[in-house]
Amino acid sequence: MFRGATLVNLDSKGRLSVPTRYREQLLENAAGQMVCTIDIHHPCLLLYPLPEWEIIEQKLSRLSSTNPVERRVQRLLLGHASECQMDGAGRLLIAPVLRQHAGLTKEVMLVGQFNKFELWDETTWHQQVKEDIDAEQLATGDLSERLQDLSL
């Protein structure tokens, strides 16, 4: 399980260094093999260990290629999916087209989200967090049943 937000830097070749606390788990569970794709709702990337991505692919394969909405989701997620292998120094090379989609340049937020990571431009991440907090403060109590059961 991945959790927390960590600031990492992209080097001049577009590689990011995976924080040490995740490396062993990624090597053990995925042999360092990852898949990166775009998030279709936010200006960030989704980074999955290969076994987790394969579950997503199975779900995508069950969508209808004749339904325009389902086909669009398949096209966006699969069409942008890029395999990346963690190197011996614990770095992942993020494809240029993916970096461009998320506006990633130097400072990147690696955000744990249970079975995957989100990759955000640092400034965009902080703006999104502020927007999310503001939206929660303005919320009128329209919580889903699952959120109503969440006690913090």
Curated annotation (Swiss-Prot):
<comment type="subunit">
    <text>Forms oligomers.</text>
</comment>
<protein>
    <recommendedName>
        <fullName>Transcriptional regulator MraZ</fullName>
    </recommendedName>
</protein>
<keyword id="KW-0238">DNA-binding</keyword>
<dbReference type="InterPro" id="IPR003444">
    <property type="entry name" value="MraZ"/>
</dbReference>
<feature type="domain" description="SpoVT-AbrB 2">
    <location>
        <begin position="81"/>
        <end position="124"/>
    </location>
</feature>
<keyword id="KW-0963">Cytoplasm</keyword>
<comment type="function">
    <text>Negatively regulates its own expression and that of the subsequent genes in the proximal part of the division and cell wall (dcw) gene cluster. Acts by binding directly to DNA. May also regulate the expression of genes outside the dcw cluster.</text>
</comment>
<dbReference type="InterPro" id="IPR035644">
    <property type="entry name" value="MraZ_C"/>
</dbReference>
<keyword id="KW-0678">Repressor</keyword>
<dbReference type="InterPro" id="IPR037914">
    <property type="entry name" value="SpoVT-AbrB_sf"/>
</dbReference>
<keyword id="KW-0805">Transcription regulation</keyword>
<dbReference type="InterPro" id="IPR035642">
    <property type="entry name" value="MraZ_N"/>
</dbReference>
<dbReference type="GO" id="GO:0000976">
    <property type="term" value="F:transcription cis-regulatory region binding"/>
</dbReference>
<dbReference type="InterPro" id="IPR038619">
    <property type="entry name" value="MraZ_sf"/>
</dbReference>
<feature type="domain" description="SpoVT-AbrB 1">
    <location>
        <begin position="5"/>
        <end position="52"/>
    </location>
</feature>
<comment type="similarity">
    <text>Belongs to the MraZ family.</text>
</comment>
<keyword id="KW-0804">Transcription</keyword>
<dbReference type="InterPro" id="IPR020603">
    <property type="entry name" value="MraZ_dom"/>
</dbReference>
<dbReference type="InterPro" id="IPR007159">
    <property type="entry name" value="SpoVT-AbrB_dom"/>
</dbReference>
<dbReference type="GO" id="GO:0003700">
    <property type="term" value="F:DNA-binding transcription factor activity"/>
</dbReference>
<dbReference type="GO" id="GO:0005737">
    <property type="term" value="C:cytoplasm"/>
</dbReference>
<dbReference type="Pfam" id="PF02381">
    <property type="entry name" value="MraZ"/>
</dbReference>
<keyword id="KW-0677">Repeat</keyword>
<dbReference type="GO" id="GO:2000143">
    <property type="term" value="P:negative regulation of DNA-templated transcription initiation"/>
</dbReference>
<dbReference type="GO" id="GO:0009295">
    <property type="term" value="C:nucleoid"/>
</dbReference>
